[in-house]
Amino acid sequence: STQMLSPPERPREFRHPNELRQYLKELNEYYAIMGRTRF
C-alpha cells in the first residue's frame, strides 16, 4: 500500500531542547524519504 507520509507534527512550543532536537531529526528523516521517492 502506498501511503503518503505526512511531516512530523510540530509542537506548539518546545519545552525542552530534546523536543526540538527530536522534531528536527524526524523532519530531516521525512524530507530524506520524500526527496528519495520522486516519480
UniProtKB/Swiss-Prot annotation:
Superkingdom of the organism of origin: Eukaryota
Signal peptide: none
UniProt keyword annotation of Secreted present: yes
Biological process, per Gene Ontology: neuropeptide signaling pathway
Role this protein plays: May have an important physiological role in neuroregulation.
Protein name (database record): Neuropeptide F
Residue positions where Phenylalanine amide is found in the record: F39
GO cellular component terms listed in the entry, alphabetical order: extracellular region
Tissue: Neuronal somata and fibers.
